[in-house]
Amino acid sequence: MLHCKMDEDFKIINMGKEIDLLAKYPKPNRDVIERLKHKSKEDVEIARKFGKDFFDGDRKNGYGGFSYNPKYWKPVVDDYKKYWNLNSKSSLLDVGCAKGFMLYDLSKLVPEMKLRGIDISDYAISNVVPEMKKFVQTGDAKEMPFEDNCFDVVIAINTIHNLEREDCAKALREISRVSKKYSFVVVDAYRNEVEKKKMYAWNLTGKTIMSVEEWKIFFKENNYEG
């Protein structure tokens, strides 16, 4: 399953079955014009290190403070449970799990479910929700440390577009490899030049940003079906 996210209004367009699994995620309030005025090459370089400055530093370098709040993922994981019929015997991998907030809320909703998370950021993994520490690890989406067909569901939200195009393709293949059946991938995309300009103005970490149609072609070229 592939979703393309139009950054300015958080609209999700599904390329396969019509389903929006992020419908309950709060819509962001972003001052794109202000970011465009002050965004610098240095800001981008700092953000792409995915360290403390990106998560918990100045807003110009990333989140400007990345802490747990149940309003974000708690409503969303309920839809995950219903859509994939998740239960205590299910398994799920979050690729780009950051501090494990989504995994934490899911663990509360579906106790004893097998949960795993990987993230390229040592800082994020070191500062993960305490309850999730034993379930997450530093890892690369291009070469995941898991066996084939290891998880019932693999999720990658706003993750693979942070890679160069070739590496993005590798990550897609890895997602397909470790997934038994289901995967859910969300990427930034634009529909027109206005959205494209806004997306490039706001985005700090994205290296592969394409239009909706270009993403469709890319996923088809890489045999990704979700």
Question: What are the residue ranges of the model-derived segments?
Answer:
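Conserved acidic residues
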Residues: 152, 181
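A conserved beta-strand element that flanks and buttresses the S-adenosyl-L-methionine
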Residues: 155
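Hydrophobic adenine-recognition pocket in adenosine-nucleotide-binding enzymes
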Residues: 159
